[in-house]
Each structure stands twice: as structure tokens, then as C-alpha cells.
Amino acid sequence: IDHHGIDFPKPEENVYYYNSMNSEKPSAEPVTYWAYQIAGKKEDLWLALCGCIGDGFLPDFAKQAEKEYFELWRDVKTAFEGLYETELGRITRILSFALKDRTSNVVKMMKFLFSASSRDILEENRKNTMLLRYNQVNEKYQKLLEKARNFGRKGKLLYFQYGGELSISADI
């Protein structure tokens, strides 16, 4: 499943390739949108929504999440509003930061996610090291974000350079 406008060679036999940009009506829904639509696993609604808003896309099933996860999601106008102003948005940022960690920690996160619910991610316990790591990375991120805000702008562009162990320029 893909959503980037690229030419892809004909797949091998028994390999199915779907790219919404190569359809009759090209569209750029994120992979998580299509995975959720194809799998149809209602228990993964929260995870699909996290993937979509993390990609800057507000899916049509966001209204359903409002009913099922009312304590984590509310009616929003944009994906970015959902990302920065809801608890599911916070979960999305936790997952995003977790993917930028060491490989061993990413593997632990994936094992944890196989049995986790949305609420498990926000719960502090020894099984969920993701939240602890998120808090550590988020503290550094917030300092860099504040530094970037105070840095000079030229029109709509912001030129900001930082160094260190984190690779979070897309988030900034």
C-alpha cells in the first residue's frame, strides 16, 4: 500500500500493490487510512486515526472516534488541531518519538502495541517505557521548539539549525 506518486515496476506474482495515486481518481490518503479500510478491525480505529493525523490527514472515520473515544478525541476542523489539541494527538506524538529511538526500544514498543489499547499508552507502568521516553524526548523537543520560535524568520520560512542526538526536525 502506498500513497506517493511514483512509478512502480510490475509486482511479482502473488504480490498485490495498491497506490491510491495511480487509481482512476488519484488521492493521497495515508497508508494507515487504507490499512484500516481494508482490515476493517474496529478495535484499531484509534491507531488508524493516530496514523492519519500524524500524516496531516483528517479521515472520514474521525467522527466515529469521537463517539468511541470521547475522552481522547473531540470534533476538530483539521488534522493538526487533532494532533496538538487532543489526547489521541498526544498518543500520536508519543508513537512518533518512540519510532525515533534506538532499534531495541522500537522493537519493545512494537511488541507492547500488539496487545495495547489507546488507554494503555497513556498509562505509566513498567510495561510502558514509551511514555517515560516520550517525556524525556518531549522535554528536549519543547526547549528546541521554544528556541526555534525565538529565532529569526524570513517570510513564511524559518531557518533553524540544531545539533544533538535527536532527529526531530520534521516535528519542529
Question: What is the predicted function of each stretch?
Answer:
Residues 78-133:
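Long, charge-rich alpha-helical interaction segments
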